[in-house]
């Protein structure tokens, strides 16, 4: 869901709302103290997180988008464990209890997995047509240019110290971008 200015704010907030809808549908299980926390984490990983990250492969995310997703995730996980922020329990401890990797890392994994699919396709494939490119001789307005998906991928590759040519080898690429659950 692109906005007129090319931003993804509405899409991120919509995905967070969808995650909360899934949460409410399953609140009977997730808020039950008799259900083991490991099982709650597995349910979160299989039902709620995919709903929140649906379509995120194509998002050129900014720090605030990642932060919004992270905040929503931690609120859900804390609630599932029966804790609040007042209990002053660290996020890492909560994540270990329910065995859930940070949504930020999973978001990057999804984006890099999609990048690998694109890299392995021939250059005339339809998937390359949909990529936005900046025109060289077009005058644009003042201010910083909008963040593109390619720039997000470059940043992710640099942060994770992965060479983009590795994407041509499917097995090695899968190992390089894998984010294990704790």
Model-derived regions, located:
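Short linear motifs embedded in intrinsically disordered, charge-biased segments
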Residues: 1-182
């Amino acid at each position: 869901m692109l906005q007129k200015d090319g931003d993804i704010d509405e899409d991120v907030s919509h995905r967070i709302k969808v995650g909360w809808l899934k949460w409410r549908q399953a609140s009977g299980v997730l808020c039950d103290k008799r259900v083991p926390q490991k099982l709650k984490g597995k349910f979160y990983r299989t039902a709620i997180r995919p709903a929140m990250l649906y379509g995120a492969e194509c998002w050129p995310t900014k720090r605030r988008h990642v932060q919004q997703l992270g905040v929503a995730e931690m609120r859900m996980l804390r609630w599932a464990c029966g804790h609040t922020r007042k209990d002053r329990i660290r996020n890492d401890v909560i994540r270990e209890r329910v065995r859930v990797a940070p949504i930020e890392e999973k978001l990057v994994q999804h984006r890099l997995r999609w990048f690998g699919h694109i890299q392995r396709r021939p250059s005339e494939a339809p998937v390359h047509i949909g990529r936005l490119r900046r025109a060289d001789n077009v005058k644009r307005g003042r201010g910083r240019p909008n963040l593109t998906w390619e720039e997000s991928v470059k940043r992710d590759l640099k942060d994770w110290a992965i060479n983009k040519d590795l994407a041509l080898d499917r097995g090695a690429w899968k190992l390089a971008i894998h984010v294990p659950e704790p």
